[in-house]
Amino acid sequence: KKVTAITAQAGYAVDSSSKKVLFSRNPKMKFYPASTVKLLTALVVLDNMKLKDTIRVSRRASSVAPTKAGLTRGASYSVSDLLKVLLATSANDAGVALAEAASGSQERFALLMNKKARSLGCRNSNFTNPTGLPDKRQLTTAYDLYLITRAAFNNSFIASVMRQKNVTIAGSDAKPITLRNHNKLLWRMPEPCVLGKTGYTRSAGHCYAGLAIYDDGRVIVVILKSRNPYSDIRKILSKR
């Protein structure tokens, strides 16, 4: 089926069972990933830390640019809770706190991100921070992001977090933080169920890296530099 008017400048979608490529546009062209990099951040954290480990939030982490969860500076949170707000609600403060705890600094963490990406088969990407905040050197391709997304959704913890419409966490200060999942498809599309990481900056446009779950299979779908991401995802999935 020919799909018209997909606004994304790049994308890649694969049916996991048949391995059929449902959509491919500029799969090796480099784009800014925005917050879709948080899937890679989560994979690196899970390789290096335990979910029950606790992390004290630094001044640097608490004062990072939005989007953020509003973590309390000096309070401690579990890795599990920080990953929940990182993945479901795109919290940059959680991303910085996790990166600092896993490796000492965002710069050192970026080295781990690149190493992990290479191990997954990514050949045309460069990662410089755990949040996806704008950096001209942080680039990926739709195909590389597909490899990262596939690995992320194979992780049962990441997949379970992405299903949650709302997440609530509390740190050592006992102040609960409740936030909505940024992925509007959890509300808009009952079938298939589409779990996904959103991303947006002015330079990156709208990005999305997700998993569509059908009764009889799964599709990994990635788009970069879109003007209308949810419509694009719907149109790509209609090709199945």
What are these regions (language model features)?
Residues K1-Y143, L147-S156, Y214-D215:
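Active-site-adjacent loops and short helices of periplasmic peptidoglycan-processing enzymes
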Residues C122-R123, P134-R240:
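Domain-terminus/edge residues, biased toward the C-terminal soluble/receptor-binding domains
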